[in-house]
Design a protein with these regions (language model features):
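Patatin-like phospholipase
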Residues: 1-38, 46-283
Length: 283
């Protein structure tokens, strides 16, 4: 039914996408040709395609147990990262993406991971600070579905195609870069060039499906925040959570919020299916 899918970024809110996709995909027999994801949405698009949603959620929720802080001061004093979420994310990616699973994904669809390239000759710490600051400010003031501040600053969009990943390490580097939000997540390096969170250019990179839409092929964009209005673009459908998801993007101590996001995705997926059935009956 949909030839292209977009998984927007959103950190832990992206577990909503897992619940929605797992509910809707079997009923609609979704077999998209191209799937694009940014930040944690890029991970969500891949583990849902592999049918590993339950495993990922349980592993993450288990890792949250017993944690009272987002920071690891003891590890930091010994030379580790202050925010352990980045190392935890990398460890999970290394466990998930074997050579066999990469081959499975490459044979299934044209998956693309969105990253942002900072302006050339900018020191990376400056680029990260300005890019993330501009993104957050625009989000708070304008609440756009598609951000524009990053492009105006000179950030460039880039896509890493899974078919060009020769080994799991290439995919893991792309996923880490797509979620790169210092100091929470480390800066990325892809193709010997610096890379930051794909959401700094556009958190919902539907631009990567524009050629399909222009050719008359329908696409579906999975957002991770409730929105009151979306752009009206031919052949594009947006879906979003029906309420605010009570979990912060990078938290590693809120398993209840992660489960809530997933369960809300299931409910919203069922509501979406009912709306499609109602439209079909009205025709």
């Amino acid at each position: 039914m949909y030839a292209g899918l977009v998984f927007a970024g959103g950190g832990n809110r992206c577990y909503w996408q897992g619940g929605f996709y797992e509910t809707v995909a079997p009923r609609l027999d979704l077999k998209p040709k191209r799937v694009v994801g940014a930040s944690a949405g890029a991970l969500a698009m891949l583990y849902t395609a592999l049918g590993l949603g339950h495993y990922v959620r349980e592993r993450v929720c288990e890792a949250c147990l017993g944690r009272s802080s987002e920071m690891d001061w003891a590890g930091f004093r010994q030379g580790g990262r202050l925010f352990p979420v980045g190392d935890m994310y990398h460890l999970m990616l290394t466990d998930l993406f074997t050579r066999e699973r990469l081959a499975t994904l490459q044979a299934q669809a044209d998956f693309r991971v969105a990253i942002s390239r900072p302006p050339r000759f900018w020191p990376l710490p400056v680029a990260a600070l300005l890019g993330i600051g501009a993104y957050q400010l625009e989000k708070r003031l304008r609440k756009p579905v598609h951000a524009t501040a990053g492009r105006r600053l000179g950030f460039k969009p880039d896509l890493i195609r899974l078919e060009n990943c020769a080994a799991p390490d290439d995919l893991i580097a792309a996923l880490m870069a797509s979620a790169s939000v210092p100091p929470f997540m480390p800066a990325g390096l892809v193709g010997q060039r610096a890379a930051l969170d794909g959401g700094l250019v556009d958190n919902a990179p539907a631009w990567a499906l524009a050629d399909m839409e222009a050719a008359g092929e329908p696409t579906l964009v999975l957002l991770t925040r409730p929105v009151s209005a979306v752009p009206q673009i031919a052949n594009r459908t947006y879906v979003s959570p029906s309420q605010v998801i009570p979990v912060s993007q990078f938290t590693i101590r809120n398993p209840e919020g992660i489960r809530f996001a997933y369960e809300l995705g299931i409910r919203d997926g069922e509501a979406f299916l009912r709306s499609l059935e109602a439209k079909a009956r009205a025709v």
